[in-house]
From Swiss-Prot:
Record carries keyword Transmembrane helix: yes
Induction remarks: Regulated by the transcription factor PHR2. Up-regulated in roots by phosphate starvation. Down-regulated in roots by high phosphate or colonization by the mycorrhizal fungus G.intraradices.
Lineage, opening ranks: Eukaryota, Viridiplantae, Streptophyta, Embryophyta, Tracheophyta
Entry's Gene Ontology cellular component terms: membrane
Misc. comment: Although related to the sugar transporter family, it does not transport sugars.
Role description: Low-affinity transporter for inorganic phosphate (Pi). Involved in internal Pi transport from root to shoot. Responsible for most of the PHR2-mediated accumulation of excess shoot Pi under abundant Pi conditions, but not for PHO2-mediated accumulation of excess shoot Pi. Acts as a H(+):phosphate symporter.
Name under which the protein is recorded: Inorganic phosphate transporter 1-2
Transmembrane as UniProt keyword: yes
Chain segments annotated as transmembrane: 25-45, 72-92, 100-120, 126-146, 164-184, 213-232, 297-317, 349-369, 372-392, 406-426, 443-463, 482-502
Extracellular topological segments: 46-71, 121-125, 185-212, 318-348, 393-405, 464-481
Organism: Oryza sativa subsp. japonica (Rice)
Primary subcellular site in the record, as a coarse category: membrane
Gene (name only): PTH1-2
């Protein structure tokens, strides 16, 4: 039978949009701003690291990171993120969302600064310390995924919940753009202050010693906005759903939300008891869980996994793709800072024209169109544009067609973000019960990061030319065939989306069945 709903949860579901909603979006969103900045800014500086630490000036081309080093630098933070999502997701259900929320931010800020301070001047020492700190940076970032999503979903009303969670996630777009802008400004400033010839003109002089400061400043700068929100993150009360349904203190939940909503909220003891008993009857991966949510967990993990293979491949290696099609000039025709400047400019344009608009289209339409159809549409359009890039790939390599390639490439980002990149983050925060919500979101997100790791490590090798691979790499399938693989991955994601339930307009308890009291619970209530 359906149990009566706790009054505090009804009030939250029916609440009009208020100041505390926007505060929650900003506080949680700044974490994602830093997450995206830190995860994606490394792609901007890897070519610079190759020039600084692996250049042999007797060779005709500037140095690049060896394959194993490039994979480690690019992917180590993703490995840390996967571990952090599982650990902090579980911890968020055991200790509370707020209890561990501040720790993740501290870890991100400290490790981000430490990454920029990686010590030594030899390649081994710099890369080793950089990878060490970026792993723990990723560990902190991983915690922000389940905690931010769960906190925002549990604070929001059911009418605007999708838009509010999407708005938190949309800060990722600003983080990517901010990273590109910081790199653009820093490289432009150093390029102006320390002019240098191209590598072809003078290999030794093209590597200005001051360029070593640029990548360090870029890695550290993203901590500032997130650090400013630490105080407010600690001031947020625990979510009412955790306090009432997990910590079993409905009175405290009502008191906390009375202050937030500026209204008196009281709870009936019999309703509280029915909710608590119903929530205690089964655990993660139990038969009852698998019956109610097993297919849901399969849907959220598989779609996020498939999405991140494509999304992170595109994001982390767009600099290589732009070089291959000729949008960025050959490395030897530029000095180290000029190359960083051009890569940053390209990423800023893609973020501004494709990435950010996609996020905010999701914010605008998710509570109108629904999660399911946005995800289906996004995967479908990503498949179409990947094929549009891959089928006539030789056409796009001609200088006259570079602009068309960039436009189509930007559109794949637009429909990733106005599509599965946003919805795979939102849905797991809505469809699982309160006691397991953070854990299940962490599992879903970790599955996504497993896909990202495949994208980060696999695409680097797979996209190598079939006849003329980069130094240190074996022959790959080429960018054209790699685009076909990504198109197939997106198509599989569209098929797996058929398992995703629609949560538009429903309360969290209606989706998770937290307010359903089964026969065992009824007997326990009767005996109490």
């Amino acid at each position: 039978m359906a149990g009566s709903q706790l009054n505090v949860l009804v009030k939250l579901d029916q609440a009009k949009t208020q100041w505390y909603h926007f505060m929650a979006i900003v506080i949680a969103g700044m974490g994602f701003f830093t997450d995206a900045y830190d995860l994606f800014c490394i792609a901007l500086v890897t070519k610079l690291l190759g020039r600084l630490y692996y250049t042999d000036i007797t060779k005709p081309n500037p140095g690049t990171l060896p394959p194993n080093v490039s994979s480690a630098v690019t992917g180590v933070a993703l490995c840390g993120t996967l571990a952090g999502q599982l650990f902090f997701g579980w911890l968020g259900d055991k200790l509370g969302r707020k209890s561990v929320y501040g720790f993740t931010l501290i870890l991100m800020v400290v490790c981000s600064i430490a990454s920029g301070l990686s010590f030594g001047h030899t390649p081994k020492s710099v890369i080793a310390t950089l990878c060490f700190f970026r792993f723990w940076l990723g560990f902190g970032i991983g915690g922000d995924y389940p905690l931010s999503a769960t906190i925002m979903s549990e604070y929001a009303s059911k009418k605007t919940r999708g838009a509010f969670i999407a708005a938190v996630f949309a800060m990722q777009g600003f983080g990517i753009l901010f990273g590109a802008i910081v790199a653009l400004v820093v490289s432009a400033g150093f390029r102006h202050a320390y002019p240098a010839p191209s590598y072809a003109q003078n290999p030794a002089a093209s590597l200005a010693p001051q360029a070593d400061y640029t990548w360090r400043l870029i890695l550290m700068f993203g901590t500032i906005p997130a650090g400013l929100t630490y105080y407010w993150r600690m001031k947020m009360p625990e979510t009412a759903r955790y306090t009432a349904l997990v910590a079993r203190n409905a009175k405290q939940a009502a008191a906390d939300m009375s202050k937030v909503l500026h209204a008196e909220i009281e709870e009936r003891p019999e309703v509280v008891e029915s909710q608590v008993v119903a929530g205690e009857t089964w655990g993660l991966f139990s038969r009852q869980f698998m019956k109610r949510h097993g297919m849901h967990l399969l849907a959220t993990t598989s779609t996020w996994f498939l999405l991140d293979i494509a999304f992170y491949s595109q994001n982390l290696f767009q600099k290589d793709i732009f070089s291959k099609v000729g949008w960025i000039p050959p490395a030897k025709t530029m000095n180290a800072l000029e190359e960083l400047y051009r890569i940053s400019r390209a990423q800023a344009l893609i973020a501004l024209c494709g990435t950010i608009p996609g996020y905010w289209f999701t914010v605008a339409f998710i509570d109108i169109v629904g999660r399911f159809w946005i995800q289906i549409m996004g995967f479908f359009m990503m498949t179409v544009f990947m094929l549009a890039l891959g089928v006539p790939y030789d056409h796009w390599t001609h200088p006259a067609h570079h602009t068309g390639f960039v436009v189509l490439y930007a559109l794949t980002f637009f429909f990733a973000n106005f599509g599965p990149n946003s919805t795979t983050f939102i849905v797991p925060a809505e469809i699982f019960p309160a006691r397991l919500r953070s854990t299940c979101h962490g599992i879903s997100a970790a599955s996504g990061k497993a896909g990202a790791i495949i994208g980060a490590f696999g695409f680097l090798y797979a996209a190598q030319d079939q006849h003329n691979p980069d130094a240190g790499y074996s022959r790959g399938i080429g960018i054209r065939n790699a685009l076909f693989v990504l198109a197939g991955t997106n198509f599989l994601g569209m098929l797996m989306t058929l398992l995703v339930p629609e949560s538009k307009g429903l309360s969290l308890e209606e989706m998770s069945k937290d307010n359903v009291v089964d026969e065992t619970a009824q007997e326990a209530i009767a005996q109490a």
